[in-house]
Structure formats: C-alpha cells, structure tokens
C-alpha cells in the first residue's frame, strides 16, 4: 500500500530516486519492476508490475468505443527497473507528456503512484481546494 507525497528531483538523465520507504515494497512485490504510463490528468502513473498487469487487463477489456483510451494507457506504457541506486528512468517521451523537468511530486495512491510536475500539482491542488468539497464528500466525516 503506497501513500503519502514526496517532493523529488529528476536528474539530467531523467532518473528519479524512489523514496526508501517504497523501495523495499517494490522489490518484494515486483522485484523492482515498474510500468510507467500517461494519465489523462497530465501526470504519469507508476505501477508495480503485478498491479500493472491487473490494470492492463481492465484497459484491454474496454469496449471498442474506448479505443483511444487503450492507446493512451497501453501505447505509452514503458517498463522500467529500479537500478542499484534505487532510481527509475522516466523516458523523454513520458517526461514531455507530463511536463516534467526537474522538480516533481510522487504521490502514493494505494496500489500505484502518480508522478506530477511540482508546479502543476500545486496549482491543481489549490484549484480543487478552492472549489470546495464535491458532493460525494459532503457526508464524509474527517
């Protein structure tokens, strides 16, 4: 289970150091293998490989009218491995798609992660908070 936010930096080659608190879980759950793909909100999704296989099966089963979504998720997916220093390489294509340059935010989302450009994430978070609680959360107790 992945949760929490980590402010990270991409190096000049596009490598990101995975926080130590997630490395052991990724090694145990997925032998350090992850899959990275686009998300329609403008970030990237990072899945441990077993979780990716579950997600991939759901996407592949979508009806024909969702063929563009299959292209977005599956056609842009890249398999990567944690290196000996606990880093993953984010491809230039995926960095460009998500507007990632240097400062990024890694969010644990339960079974997977989202990777955002820090400025984009902060702006979207502020906009969401300014809109107030959605109806789905009106009766939710904190």
From Swiss-Prot:
InterPro entries: MraZ (IPR003444), MraZ_C (IPR035644), MraZ_dom (IPR020603), MraZ_N (IPR035642), MraZ_sf (IPR038619), SpoVT-AbrB_dom (IPR007159), SpoVT-AbrB_sf (IPR037914). It holds the Pfam family MraZ. GO terms for molecular function: DNA-binding transcription factor activity; transcription cis-regulatory region binding. It is found in: Cytoplasm, Nucleoid. Residues 5-51, 77-120 form the SpoVT-AbrB domain. One of its GO terms (cellular component) is nucleoid. GO terms for biological process: negative regulation of DNA-templated transcription initiation. Keywords: Cytoplasm, DNA-binding, Repeat, Transcription, Transcription regulation. Forms oligomers. Belongs to the MraZ family. This is Transcriptional regulator MraZ. The lineage of its organism: Bacteria, Pseudomonadati, Pseudomonadota, Betaproteobacteria, Burkholderiales.
């Amino acid at each position: 289970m992945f949760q929490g936010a980590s402010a990270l930096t991409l190096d000049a080659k596009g490598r990101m150091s995975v926080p130590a608190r997630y490395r052991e879980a990724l090694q145990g759950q997925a032998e350090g293998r992850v899959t990275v793909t686009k998300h329609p909100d403008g970030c990237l999704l990072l899945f441990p490989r077993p979780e990716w296989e579950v997600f991939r099966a759901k996407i592949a089963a979508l009806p024909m009218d969702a063929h563009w979504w299959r292209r977005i998720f599956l056609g842009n997916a890249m398999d990567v491995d944690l290196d000996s220093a606990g880093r993953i390489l984010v491809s230039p294509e995926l960095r460009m798609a998500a507007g990632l340059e240097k400062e990024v935010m890694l969010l644990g989302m339960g079974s997977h992660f989202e990777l955002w450009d820090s400025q984009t994430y902060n702006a979207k978070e502020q906009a969401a908070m300014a809109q107030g609680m959605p109806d789905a959360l009106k009766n939710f107790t904190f």
